[in-house]
Swiss-Prot record:
This is Putative uncharacterized protein DDB_G0293796. Residues 1-20, 25-47 are annotated as: Disordered. It comes from Dictyostelium discoideum (Social amoeba). Residues 25-40 have a biased composition (Basic and acidic residues).
């Protein structure tokens, strides 16, 4: 059994997976920020 498979079984993310997770988090934050800005614009328009 290769150590790579062993790592996966133990549930530890590989280097690549960790990088993808970081990228995803960044994207999520960005989308959230844009969404908040959009929401504020629409709220201001109504008021």
């Amino acid at each position: 059994m290769s150590t790579d498979n062993f790592e996966k079984i133990k549930g530890r993310p590989t280097q690549k997976e960790e990088w993808q997770l970081k990228e995803w988090e960044k994207e999520k934050d960005e989308n959230n920020r844009l969404f908040q800005e959009q929401k504020q614009k629409t709220t201001n328009r109504k008021g």
